[in-house]
């Protein structure tokens, strides 16, 4: 956790500002990702879903960890249209050799991206943010190392043609058929799927949101 400006550490970072925050029980997930919905539901939370339209353009030279937190904050604020609710936004990216790998734009790019991470270890970073009204009350990010086995061109093309990787950062789905390409995971598995549950659940509880409410 950091409480003053500075360089972000390599692992989870969290900013808190709960001094005047009213305890709320209504939760909104500002995400169109079905994986995040499943994770949050599996954690026992009741919530509504909004899919805010947010510009996800990468700023040249921006660090990936700061980028995902920025986008998560923008999503949470865009979804904060109900004053009596806490809104959760999140954004996930894959980083290989310092290069951000977003969602592939088609099958060819998906196959190429999958082959580029095959036989290597990449970093998955997910940023998250909680908003109430027009302000962010807490945010942070989590990193996970993922080692992949080698993927040959035929295998990559077949997987891309299945459609599964087309809306996934890094062009694979850990919770789906893409799991067969993963050889090991160093860090939270849920973070790779799209939401680091431990810090998010803790933050939601601090915001007055409890599982099962």
Language-model segments: residues:
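Residue-level detector of anion-binding/catalytic polar loops
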Residues: 46-48, 210
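N-terminal beta1-alpha1 ligand-phosphate binding loop
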Residues: 25-45
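Cofactor-binding loop segments of dinucleotide-utilizing enzymes, especially the Rossmann-like FAD-
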Residues: 32, 52, 133
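A short beta-strand-loop structural module common to alpha/beta enzyme folds
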Residues: 48-56
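Anionic-ligand binding patches
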Residues: 22-28, 61-213
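Intrinsic-disorder-associated, low-complexity terminal segments enriched in Asp/Asn/His/Tyr and depleted
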Residues: 10, 15-20
């Amino acid at each position: 956790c950091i409480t003053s400006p500075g360089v972000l550490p390599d692992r989870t970072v969290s900013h808190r500002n709960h001094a005047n925050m009213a305890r709320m029980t209504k939760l909104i997930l500002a995400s169109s990702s079905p994986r995040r919905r499943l994770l949050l539901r599996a954690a026992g939370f009741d919530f509504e879903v909004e899919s805010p339209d947010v510009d996800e353009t990468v700023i040249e030279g921006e660090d990936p960890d700061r980028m995902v937190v920025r986008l998560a904050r923008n999503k949470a604020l865009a979804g904060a249209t109900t004053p009596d609710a806490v809104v959760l936004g999140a954004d996930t990216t894959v980083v290989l050799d310092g290069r951000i790998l977003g969602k592939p734009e088609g099958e060819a790019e998906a196959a190429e991206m999958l082959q580029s991470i095959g036989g290597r270890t990449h970093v998955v970073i997910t940023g998250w943010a909680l908003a109430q009204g027009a302000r962010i009350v807490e945010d942070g990010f989590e990193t996970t190392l993922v080692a992949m086995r080698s993927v040959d061109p035929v295998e990559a093309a077949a997987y891309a043609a299945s459609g599964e990787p087309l809306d996934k950062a890094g062009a694979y789905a850990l919770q789906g058929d893409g799991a067969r390409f993963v050889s090991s995971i160093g860090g939270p598995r849920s973070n790779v799927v799209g939401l680091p549950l431990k810090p998010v659940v803790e933050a939601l509880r601090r915001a007055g949101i409890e599982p099962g409410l």
